């Protein structure tokens, strides 16, 4: 097409160990979102490949990879707005076909770990603050017990204390 592309990432290589937490940090425009988009399969690299457990994600199949192996929590939370917080988290299990006898209690415990009260869990999503909605989105990812959870600005709408609480919850879950 004659247009020259800007290189955002050049010869980037990352390896991650199970049970560890990593942060992609950098200045605005440094490639953080691009890195997450590539790792999630939302974008395809111009060169090279993205491996997950030693297999190219293109060969795994992007639908299978995104449905079974990873969860993505971006700045837009993709919550179901006609449900309350608890129903949103339980729906993530239903969509994945995960059956649990203790589904309600399990999802409620995750939401409570992330700082939502039982009353807040019963509230319509639109009645929750941006930070509370963010915690619901994170709870949806945690509930599915994915091998890899990718978060972009996962603490961006939270104050310093709640941000630290979220990071500590991720650390607890990783251990």
Language model: regions and residue ranges:
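Conserved ABC ATPase signature
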Residues: 124-128, 132-134
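Catalytic Walker B motif of ABC-type/P-loop ATPase nucleotide-binding domains
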Residues: 149-152
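Helix-to-loop junction immediately C-terminal to a conserved catalytic motif
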Residues: 40
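Conserved ABC transporter NBD signature motif
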Residues: 48-56
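The feature captures the beta-strand-to-loop junction immediately N-terminal to the Walker
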Residues: 25-27
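ABC ATPase NBD coupling module
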Residues: 57-71
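Conserved ABC ATPase "signature" region
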Residues: 101-119
């Amino acid at each position: 097409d004659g247009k020259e592309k800007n290189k955002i990432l050049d010869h980037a290589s990352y390896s991650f160990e199970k049970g560890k937490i990593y942060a992609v940090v950098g200045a605005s425009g440094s490639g953080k979102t691009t890195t997450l988009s590539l790792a999630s399969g939302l974008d395809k690299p111009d060169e090279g490949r993205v491996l997950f457990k030693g297999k190219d994600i293109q060969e795994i199949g992007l639908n299978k990879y995104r449905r079974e192996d990873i969860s993505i929590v971006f700045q837009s939370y993709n919550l179901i707005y006609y449900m309350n917080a608890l129903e949103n988290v339980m729906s993530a299990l239903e969509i994945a076909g995960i059956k649990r006898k203790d589904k309600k209690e399990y999802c409620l415990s995750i939401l409570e770990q992330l700082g939502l009260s039982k009353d807040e869990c019963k509230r319509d999503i639109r009645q929750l603050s941006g930070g509370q909605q963010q915690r619901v989105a994170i709870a949806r990812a945690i509930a599915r017990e994915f091998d890899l959870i990718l978060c972009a600005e996962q603490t961006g709408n939270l104050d310093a204390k709640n941000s630290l609480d979220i990071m500590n919850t991720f650390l607890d879950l990783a251990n």
